[in-house]
Amino acid sequence: MPRYKAVIAYDGAEFFGFQLQTKNGVESVRTVQGELNKVINKMAKNPSPQIKVVGASRTDTGVHAFGQVVHFDLPFNIDPEGVRKGMNTLLPFDVVVNHVEHVSDDFHARFNTHSKRYIYRVSTTDYKDPFKRKYTGHFHWKLDINRIKAALPDLLGEHDFASFAASGNETATTIRLITRADVDEKPEEHEIVFTFEGNAFLYNQIRIMVGVLLEIGTGKRPVHDIVRLIEVKDREQARYTAPASGLYLDEIDYN
C-alpha cells in the first residue's frame, strides 16, 4: 500500500486536541485525527480494517497548527495532488491540507522527526480582545521586553526540563534540546510572539516556559530564574501556564 505524507493546518479552537479520543470504541469528542480518519476512509471506500492517520504531534485542546505532519497508507495509488484536493473537498472548514507527497514505506510522521518549531502569540492589550480570545494568550500586565530577551538564552541547549513538564507528561526522560528561543514585538498588533525550536518538547513545556518568561518580564522573577528552575527540577516552582489558545505548531523538520 502506498504511503503518503501530508502537511496540514487547523484552527484548534473547536477541537479537543489532535489525537483521536474514543469511548467504547466510538469517537467521543471532536478531534483533528478523527476528522482526518473519516475523510481518508471515505476516499478509500471504507476499507476493512479502517485506515488510521498518524500525526507527528499530539496537540492539545485549543492548540492550533500551521504545519502539522501526518502519514497514512491508501489501498490504491493516487496522485498526491489528487489526494490533497480530495481531502480538502471533504474536510471541515477549520482543517486544510496544504501539501501531499509520496514517501517510503518506512517513513513515520512521529518517529522520524528531527525538530519541531512552535510559536506562541501573546496579546498585550489592557482589555481582552473578543476577536483574539481563541488565538492568543492574553497578558495585560506591563512587560519589560528586554528582561525577556535577556532570559531566553538560558533555555538554549540540552537540559533537564522537569520543572517545565506538566503532570500528564509520559515521556521516559525530561531531557530536551532547545536550539532556538526568541521573541518579537508586534506593536501594531499589540502582541509579542515567541518562537521555540527543539528536538522535542514535554507536555505543556512551551506554555510553561512562556508563563515563566512573562513573569520575568513583569519583574516577578529574576532575569535568570530559568537557570534555577532547571536546576531544582520542581514543576510547582514554575507556577503559571500560559493558555492553550496562543500556541501554534509552526513547522516540523525531517532532515
Curated annotation (Swiss-Prot):
The keyword tRNA processing applies. Substrate binds at Y118. GO terms for molecular function: RNA binding; tRNA pseudouridine(38-40) synthase activity. It is an enzyme of class 5 (isomerase). SUPFAM superfamilies: Pseudouridine synthase. InterPro entries: PsdUridine_synth_cat_dom_sf, PsdUridine_synth_TruA, PsdUridine_synth_TruA_a/b_dom, PsdUridine_synth_TruA_C, TruA/RsuA/RluB/E/F_N. One of its GO terms (biological process) is tRNA pseudouridine synthesis. It holds the Pfam family PseudoU_synth_1. It catalyses: uridine(38/39/40) in tRNA = pseudouridine(38/39/40) in tRNA. Gene3D superfamilies: Pseudouridine synthase I, catalytic domain, C-terminal subdomain, Pseudouridine synthase I, catalytic domain, N-terminal subdomain. Its EC number is 5.4.99.12. The active site is at D60 (nucleophile). The keyword Endoplasmic reticulum does not apply. Keywords: Isomerase, tRNA processing. Belongs to the tRNA pseudouridine synthase TruA family. Formation of pseudouridine at positions 38, 39 and 40 in the anticodon stem and loop of transfer RNAs. Homodimer. This is tRNA pseudouridine synthase A. The gene is truA.
